[in-house]
């Protein structure tokens, strides 16, 4: 049963930063400088990433949902016998302006930064044996002031094969499981509860409209999903329909929705987050204080499409749940049909464009 819930922060540890969202930019991301990511094994499942600016321009790199993020976000894909190992960490959405300086790294041409992280924390590698690590995609960049997202840059890594000790890896993953099971549940109250319920009702209505738009097909499907065939339209419409059903059910359903952060994950950059393995969604304080229920500006953020974005991550709503492959309009429209169908922000932007009349 889904509960719309809220509680003061209770946590086993504190997390500081999460996934990025990209503002529209005038320049195509394919013209941006490329980041090279070199993956090496430090010890066991601890990996070092060296990120180098191979372009000829200065870059302000957003670290949220990327290397140097201290949160249990997805940094690499892990493959065992050719099959990707499911991600067991956290997916989040954060604001696109007013970002704090501690989540930005400046890289001049030729400069690098490093990050070390344990891949066993966010993926169940208890079976052990050889696995292959790799990552590629688009990372947000900020303007010269470093406060507002203004572009994207492409990154790609080498393939790294490591041999995993399953017993040791299981202990790391168990720490994440403990983290997501310690909170107490309580109901949403006061203005935050009212705001959340309003957003969920409007999310249901908007998702229904988006499903109808997808079924009808046309230029918007080509713009966001790069396809207009029957099969693609059906997949898009079916996910939107599932989100509409889930968000309209405030007393049942398959997800637990918190009005307040139960795990001390939120920061002043984070709007909301999802723990897909638990089908758990939580709003953060700025969901209420910095965003309207609906934003009529094209590609803008608001409460309704933030909730929609998070619902698409939950596999209990529609399987498989979406990933965070790209954020923001200019990054999302670069995706292939396959990636767009698995990208949360593509669905959020498609739906938001209906409200905004884009």
Curated annotation (Swiss-Prot):
Catalysis performed (reactions): Preferential cleavage of bonds with hydrophobic residues in P1'. Also 3-Asn-|-Gln-4 and 8-Gly-|-Ser-9 bonds in insulin B chain
Family matches, as InterPro entries: Fungal_M35_metalloproteases, Lys_MEP, MetalloPept_cat_dom_sf, Peptidase_M35
Note on how the cofactor is bound: Binds 1 zinc ion per subunit.
Entry annotation: catalytic residues: 310
Signal peptide: 1-19
Protein name: Neutral protease 2 homolog PABG_02362
Record key words, sorted: Cleavage on pair of basic residues, Disulfide bond, Glycoprotein, Hydrolase, Metal-binding, Metalloprotease, Protease, Secreted, Signal, Zinc, Zymogen
Cofactor field: Zn(2+)
UniProt xrefs under SMART domains: Aspzincin_M35 (SM01351)
Gene Ontology cellular component terms for the protein in this record: extracellular region
Bridged cysteine pairs (disulfide): 188-259, 266-284
Its biological purpose: Secreted metalloproteinase that allows assimilation of proteinaceous substrates. Shows high activities on basic nuclear substrates such as histone and protamine.
A Pfam family: Peptidase_M35
Residue numbers binding Zn(2+): 309, 313, 324
Family: Belongs to the peptidase M35 family.
Biological source species: Paracoccidioides brasiliensis (strain Pb03)
């Amino acid at each position: 049963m889904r509960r719309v819930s809220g509680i003061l922060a209770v946590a086993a540890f504190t997390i500081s930063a999460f996934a990025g969202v990209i503002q529209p930019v005038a320049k195509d991301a394919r013209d941006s400088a490329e980041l090279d990511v070199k993956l090496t094994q430090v010890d066991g499942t601890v990996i070092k990433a060296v990120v180098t600016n191979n372009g000829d321009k200065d870059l302000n790199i957003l670290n949220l949902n990327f290397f140097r993020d201290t949160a249990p976000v997805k940094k690499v894909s892990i493959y065992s016998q050719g099959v990707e190992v499911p991600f067991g960490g956290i997916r989040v959405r954060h604001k696109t302006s007013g970002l704090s300086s501690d989540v930005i790294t400046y890289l001049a041409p030729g400069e690098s930064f490093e990050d070390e992280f344990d891949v066993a924390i966010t993926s169940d590698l208890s079976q052990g044996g050889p696995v292959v690590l790799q990552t590629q995609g688009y990372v947000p960049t900020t303007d010269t002031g470093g406060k507002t997202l203004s572009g994207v840059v492409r990154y790609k890594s080498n393939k790294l094969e490591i041999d995993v000790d399953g017993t040791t890896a299981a202990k790391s993953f168990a720490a994440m499981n403990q983290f997501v099971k310690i909170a107490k549940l309580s109901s949403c109250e006061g203005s935050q509860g009212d705001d959340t319920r309003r957003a969920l009702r409007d999310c249901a209505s908007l998702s229904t409209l988006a499903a109808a738009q997808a079924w009808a097909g046309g230029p918007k499907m080509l713009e966001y999903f790069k396809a207009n065939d029957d099969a693609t339209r059906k997949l898009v419409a079916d996910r939107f329909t599932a989100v509409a059903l889930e968000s309209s059910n405030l007393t049942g359903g398959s997800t637990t929705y918190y009005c307040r952060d139960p795990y001390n994950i939120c920061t002043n950059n984070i709007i909301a987050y999802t723990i897909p393995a638990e089908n758990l969604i939580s709003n953060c304080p700025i969901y209420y204080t910095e965003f309207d229920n609906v934003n009529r500006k094209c590609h803008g953020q608001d409460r309704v499409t933030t909730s929609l974005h998070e619902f698409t991550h939950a596999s209990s709503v529609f399987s498989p749940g979406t990933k965070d492959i790209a954020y923001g309009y200019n990054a999302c429209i670069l995706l292939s049909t396959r990636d767009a169908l698995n990208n949360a922000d593509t669905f959020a932007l498609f739906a938001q464009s209906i409200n905004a009349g884009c």
